[in-house]
Design a protein with these regions (language model features):
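C-terminal binding/interaction regions
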Residues: 21
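A short linear hydrophobic-aromatic micro-motif
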Residues: 38-44, 86-87
Length: 100
């Protein structure tokens, strides 16, 4: 089993309301859920209006597929162009299922 995790931090230019931040989060979530089979959650900076931190995860049986999926997800978010990606980190974890 291969687990892909990605942590992304964004800067929201000109945002001054929680409503505006939620709109950006919802747009990113909706786009990714429609295009990719991933789970998404806002994981930090929830009280900072111009900062957004989301986590994305997916599970597969193939490491090369997972590497490609995480790259495609990051590129798709960048193309949405609702916020600037300040930083991101991707990890691919392998878990043995032989003992089950």
């Amino acid at each position: 089993m291969v687990i892909g995790c990605c942590s992304l931090r964004f800067y929201l230019h000109g945002n001054n309301s929680l409503k505006g931040k939620r709109r950006v989060v919802r747009a990113i979530k909706d786009r990714l859920k429609n295009d990719f089979n991933v789970s998404i959650a806002e994981v930090g900076n929830q009280d900072v209006l111009q900062s957004l931190h989301i986590g994305i995860s997916a599970v597969s049986s193939d490491k090369p597929y997972m590497d490609g999926l995480m790259t495609k997800v990051i590129n798709a978010i960048d193309k949405i162009n609702l916020a600037d990606i300040v930083d991101y980190k991707t990890e691919i974890l392998s878990m043995s299922t032989d003992n089950y």
